[in-house]
């Protein structure tokens, strides 16, 4: 079992909207660049950036237009549900890389993501572009049924998406997209099309208690493997929240086959992961969704023992 150590909570300099809480609660995607970490939340229109060291409150960068209501039920119905954050390295228009915020696709209003170019120091530049996933997700829904995309990572020439199969009819799946085609579409400002899909494979990750574990995020390793998080949430569908029975961390082989899975020592809803190899070991940063807007999401760290770096 992996031992989680809390590094900080995701407090903000100011709330996203007047009357809101000055923190990120529903943390759902995580990427480290330079001396900062970037987080998307599934109930937010912004990217949050935090210093890697210390507890200095984070800052916000708008990703999508509009405003979300404070009322939890109304907010849930209108939110863009940004569930994954992916670091891209080979965009001609972003020489220092870019962040791709990926929506879940679980409802018709959850089809728009965002592309954020990075500066040399890894900070977002503010030159944000909207990315339309509608046509791509329509194709994936025809193959998988209800969508709930929660992980994205660039692995070699493929952009790998992880579909969360929580609920009665959802399917956990590894979806490989043609990375070159995706990057060209992003560079041209075009919507992502069905022709970027290469393979779609379903997987069963097992259970925590009597509840099925389902993918919640992904992070690449240098050799093409991908670290993923998974959570067992007792819910009937991809829209509703439920009791969290446990979370786990795993590894996908370069071909997308699950090759390692281990639980964590706290009953938290892990939703975001960043992985890097340091001193011959795989070090992880992780965020959890508090599922309570009054509670700040935690940032954890751990070392992935038992897996060669």
Description of each model-found segment:
Residues 1-309:
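Sequence/structural signature of beta-propeller domains
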